[in-house]
Amino acid sequence: MLQRAYRFLLSLWRRAASNPEALQRRIDAQISRAVTNVGSGNLARARLELSKALEEAPRHPGALKVQTCVLLELGALEEASQAVARLQSLTPGQPEVAVLAALVEQRSQTPAPDWRGALIQAWNRVGRPDLVEAEPFPSPLPDTTAFVERVWERTQSPEVRFTAMLADGASDAQRQWLAAHVAGLEDAALLLAAYEYFLPRSGEDALADVRRQARETLRRKIEPLIPRMHESEGPLLLLLGESAKEASLTQENIHALERIAGLPRYRRTSLAQAYADAKQRLELTAVTAPPLRVLQAAVASMVTDAVVILWTRVEATKEHLSAEDRVRLGRTVFTLGARIAEGATLSDRMLGLRHMELGAEWMADVEKLAQVKRELEHGRAVAEASSALQVDSWPLPSLHRAWLQASLDDEWNSLSILVAP
């Protein structure tokens, strides 16, 4: 019996050896399993998968990159140095390998810089390469069951189910269910997010009536809250959400915008609070929610559509105003933009600055326009630098936690360090 099993396994090995594509697929799967285990914190299992892959393909760059990251995560710095040195000899000139090697060196210092600081220093040291076009780190295995499905199986709560939809996406059937149950939403931030979620979408006529009915229900719940709001996001969303995006503003709209611009803040909820709220809701289901899923839900719950609509409608109004009214509207748009730009996220900062730029142009305020353009240039540099690092792709949970926390504390300031002089 044992001999028969041994012969069977040997035949499988020979078949794989004679089929390089099958062998490559198996090795790639082992590496993806290793990355999946890294993400779940099972580093011992990840090392086992990597040892199997490297036994068959000792020169596999992806396996060596993940191995270096696992050793870094474990604090095995000498082994990590050896692994990355081997990787460098096999892949000379690869920018992501250069950054990884510099990261190992940074973390080997005494005292070692924190994960976030170490990566930034490593990236700066090797010339700040753009890793968007670099050879990516291996990816984890795809989920066999969608996150939203796992959450929906555990709860009937509209708020929890909607949070899962924001974190992962949804089917038409799930959207229809939520539309029929939006009356069960109570949290003000989720009410606004749901209203935005059900705004008309181009090319989706099959759900047009469903979206409209959901918005009608949500508007009835939101409108009584508006007088008590000290933030402009809710009133702005209700004012512009239903309108044709390319239509010019009416005088009534302009008066309403002036009132909205007089409110002291744009956001009612910070990214950190939105993250904490989403995490708390998802934890009720006992489904493990990866931090990036929670972050996606938090970001998606912070409404932005009204700001984009405002831009297009203001632009469409330009030719219908007198010079005096144009200056007046420009002042309103500049003020609203400034409120939005006070947010701590990169998105809010850039959206706000774009509206401030438009407002300054309409006011013909040369000094303000020049200042805003400088800030926009800085913001674009920050966005490009953030993208260049490709932090989400690094299989380093400690780095992800540190980066996430800095973003929740103050994303704009934490990313501005990337382009600090």
Positions of predicted regions on the chain:
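Alpha-helical segment of the N-proximal tetratricopeptide repeat
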Residues: 23-52, 56, 131-139, 156-169
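Register position in tetratricopeptide repeats
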Residues: 39-40, 73-74, 106-110
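Short coil turns that delineate tetratricopeptide repeat
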Residues: 24, 58, 92, 183-186, ...
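Canonical positions in the second alpha-helix
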Residues: 53, 86-87, 181, 225, ...
